[in-house]
């Protein structure tokens, strides 16, 4: 199992055929349902209310920052919905370490290598805080920092566990709702930041490749 997980991780990072990679990743992840999300894992985040996946592609916003757009995508089989979970640059966390509630994380879009980002620009449809993708390998700032908040009594992030991601700079929670983009196909909906805690702020780690927990001390 460990070998197959690592092989799938390599395929994901090298950008293998999207359909085959998606199918293989889902098969691997279903076998380890409920395991811990670790740094270096490549996962899809599912919005609890609408079941859309957090998604991005190399298409800029037509307003606000003009940075790479982020949306909610209704289809499961799409390789543009994979995100690599990374620690903050000044953290001592290593690949394979479990992630506790309160940790500051970054999410790197697998395909474009840009970071999930937010700032004070208004989002296109609702006028909330814009969420974009920005930067790249070796280019990251505090606008890419998100604090993990686990719902309930859990202390360590696991697959299928309800979580919120709160943007460190703006205080906005990663949020989505059923406001749809007309110019984007496939029923894509707005992702934005909202400072209030709402049911629409809740996400779950879903399909993906979950790296084994690092047991070394």
Regions found by a protein language model. Give the residues of each.
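Lectin-like carbohydrate-binding module/patch detector with strong preference for beta-trefoil
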Residues: 2-4, 8-217
């Amino acid at each position: 199992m460990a070998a197959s997980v690592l092989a799938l991780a390599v395929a994901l990072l090298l950008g293998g055929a999207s359909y085959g990679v998606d199918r293989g990743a889902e098969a691997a992840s279903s076998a380890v349902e409920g395991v811990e999300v670790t740094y270096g894992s490549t996962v899809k985040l599912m919005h609890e209310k609408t079941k859309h996946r957090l998604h991005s592609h190399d298409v800029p916003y037509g307003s606000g920052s003009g940075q790479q757009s982020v949306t909610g995508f209704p289809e499961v089989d799409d390789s543009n919905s994979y995100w690599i979970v990374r620690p903050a640059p000044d953290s001592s966390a290593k690949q394979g370490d479990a992630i506790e509630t309160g940790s500051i994380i970054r999410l790197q879009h697998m395909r474009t290598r840009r970071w999930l980002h937010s700032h004070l620009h208004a989002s296109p449809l609702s006028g909330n805080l814009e969420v974009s993708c920005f930067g790249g390998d070796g280019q990251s700032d505090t606008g890419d920092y998100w604090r993990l908040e686990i719902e309930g009594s859990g202390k360590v992030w696991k697959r299928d566990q309800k979580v919120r991601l709160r943007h460190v700079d703006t205080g906005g929670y990663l949020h989505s709702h059923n406001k749809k983009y007309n110019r984007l196909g496939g029923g894509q909906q707005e992702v934005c930041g909202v400072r209030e805690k709402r049911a629409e702020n809740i996400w779950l780690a879903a399909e993906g490749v979950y790296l084994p927990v690092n047991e070394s001390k």
